[in-house]
Amino acid sequence: MRIIAGNWRGRPLIAPKGTETRPTADRTREALFSMLVSRLGTLDGLRVLDLFAGSGALGLEALSRGAGHCTFVEQDSAALDALRTNIAKLGAAPQCDVRAQSVMALGPAIAPYDLLLLDPPYRSGAGVVALERCLRLGWLASGALVTVETA
């Protein structure tokens, strides 16, 4: 697993130990971000919210491509270890906020986000619930884009 493009292109990422998470494949991330850049023109300066963040591959890819900030939300301890290691290895800490909590425990937003990256556990229904929660609690800016990975 690696960063596909941008400032950290080719830099390796570690995956969480165990079988609780399944990182988004490089090819899938490449296709997703190609679509996002095609739609937006650039990710420069965007505020990104990466829910069910796992290793952080999606949010870190956004930062590598110019996003200004990413908040990662993850509750699994192995995934958090991998996420924090990946952030440190890239020197990305100033642009990151890591929240070690359940996505379902998010309170009202302090400021809205421009891009929501949702990669919930497959067949859990958590993606729909998380999106509804983000909308209700003001996490999404007007015109924000949302991506959801499902099985």
Locate predicted features.
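Class I S-adenosyl-L-methionine-dependent methyltransferase catalytic core
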Residues: 1-151
